[in-house]
A protein has these predicted regions:
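A structural motif corresponding to the C-terminal end of an alpha-helix
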Residues: 24-37, 67-76
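Active-site segments of SGNH/GDSL-like serine hydrolases
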Residues: 27-53
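Structured catalytic/translocation cores of nucleotide/phosphate-coupled proteins
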Residues: 19-23, 39, 104-112
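Second-shell loop/turn segments in exported
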Residues: 9-16, 49-54, 90-95
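C-terminal regions of proteins
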Residues: 55, 59-122
Length: 122
């Protein structure tokens, strides 16, 4: 609850505007030459995920995720409550352990490879 509470205080309208300002500056450069950019919410324990308010989740969706959809070659992946992860994948209440890190890397790699295959098939 403490981490979720801290994030709720940090994530304000001004904070969202600041994030969007920097994304507008960075994304054109990052996606140059048809490069893919993936933003993701990392996996969370069920306890941490439950501690985040529904308002925080919906505000993030409205402010950031919808904003990212405006850009070519930018994807968003929400792994916050992804079923691939269990409590055994965490070293504490919010950080992945070694096995969890391997699992996350595998999921992200697969996403990039599949995205590239789709592009090559088009």
């Amino acid at each position: 609850k403490k981490t979720a509470g801290l994030n709720e205080r940090v994530v304000t309208e001004e904070g969202y505007q600041e994030v969007k300002k920097y994304l507008k500056l960075l994304l054109p450069e990052l996606t140059k030459d048809n490069r893919k950019v993936i933003f993701f919410v990392p996996p969370m324990t069920k306890y941490l995920y439950a501690a985040y308010s529904s308002k925080l989740k919906s505000d993030f969706e409205e402010q950031i995720v919808l904003f990212l959809e405006k850009f070519e070659n930018v994807e968003f992946l929400d792994l916050g409550c992804d079923s691939h992860f269990t409590d055994d994948d965490f070293g504490d209440f919010e950080h992945l352990n070694h096995n969890g890190g391997i699992k996350l890397t595998s999921i992200l790699s697969e996403k990039l490879i599949n995205s590239q295959r789709k592009e090559n098939d088009a």
